[in-house]
Amino acid sequence: MVAAVRYRALFGIPLLLAVAAVLWSFLASSGPIQWMDNGTFIADASEGRYFSDTLGPLDHPLYLFVTTALFAHFGPLVLSFMNSMLLIPLGWAIFRLAKGIGATSQQALLAIAAAVLCHCVFWVSTKAEVYLLHTLLVTLAYMVHFRDKSRLGLLTALFVIGILTGLAAAIHQLTFIVLFPLYVQLVWQHRARVLLTIPGFVLGFAVAIPGVLQEMQNGLSLIDIGHRYLIGIPDNPTEQSWQGSLFRFDDMWHEKNSVGLLMLSLLGPQLVALVLFPRSRRLRLLWCAAVLNFIFAVSYNVTDRFTFFLPGAVLLSIIGVIHVQAWLARRKAAVVAYALPFSGPVTILAVYAVYASGAVSLPTHKEALPFRDDIHYFMAPYLRDRSAETFVHSYEQSAPQGALIVADWTPNGALRSAQASGLLKGRTIALCEGAQDIESYLNGPGAFLARTSYCSSISDRFDLQTLAVGYELRAK
């Protein structure tokens, strides 16, 4: 009897916490209509185009292939839950990786819950976004490195690590930063045998090869293609480039709000892991990868820089839980470890509750969106946000079939994903910079502008009639 109770305490409770964390993500999902990139990913998947015909800095060939297949077979609703579903294999990879570096089963299960409930991981899990699949592949690569060597030989392991690296690289360039410490150790330990990762990489990266071939037909060399994929072409004014945003430590104070959003992912055992240099060599490897990821993400000059921190947050969750749980166990307070995964969410939700009561004000995006509370949307992903869906339903009422709806990038994602879900039938959706023949709509079904932000080229040309949401365009 005593043994059974002890087993439930050591294994059952942490397992329940991990399962509850994953289920919470399903409940908090933003659904098949989403803002900005997230909605655009759903819309792109609906087009039935499995392979990217370019390989630029914003292309994610493997993610496009997977989401297109998922949309074709199961539709937009299941696709909107894809990242929540990916938490299940990610949890398994975290458990195996944690065990591989010496964690107990209890610590490994607590690490799953801590990682899933970490702000950046949970936020991405509720959206259509590339970073969770990427994080799964990176975590699997480290898991294979710390494998049970009696079950998987060295040469096979190197080949598998190469495949996982290629798959991850076919999603995002962050792969080369997060896996850099792993490859340094592989070269140090195995010398020339590391070359076995190359055929694996080529195999994993195969889904991006159609884009490479198309770029070569357009006149780019392999060196130019690689440079463009990694950081863009900064000399090309029409090309979106990473180069001007990388390692912008000089601009962090000016962008302190987005830096603060990233710091929310350190509320809990992750902060302990970041500031304490591990004694264990195995933990040091994960720590180095997480620190490199943190340095990149915190200095990457974009609003949603926190989404680039998922691999580091997962690795820090494992290290932090091991550190803190062991420290608590030595002080006969091991039961407190069960609260570790919830330290971040509880803190965030408490601050949000104070904000929602009106007691304090928090900085919001200077360009507000209809129906969206930015503090709720960005800071509190644990509470479901369906503002994009509400926004779209308003246009179902105000914009008749045949109308033109012009919007900047953020609401455009919501409008396009709505069409992928069967809403806004017969309406034409256009970006502000790409809208054409607007005048032809004025005397017919009408032309509508979602908001004036980032659309001065449109708002300056027409009279704007204010509606409940957005504007109707009229000739001057």
Regions found by a protein language model. Give the residues of each.
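Signature aromatic-anchored transmembrane alpha helix within multi-pass, membrane-resident enzymes
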Residues: L15, V202, R279, H323-P363
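Transmembrane-helix motifs of polytopic, lipid-linked glycan transferases
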Residues: F81-G102, L140-V144, V272-A273, I319-I322
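Hydrophobic, aromatic-rich transmembrane alpha-helices
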Residues: A3, S258-R281
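Extracytoplasmic catalytic/substrate-binding loops of multi-pass membrane glycan-assembly enzymes
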Residues: A28-A43, D53-T67, L77, R384-S387
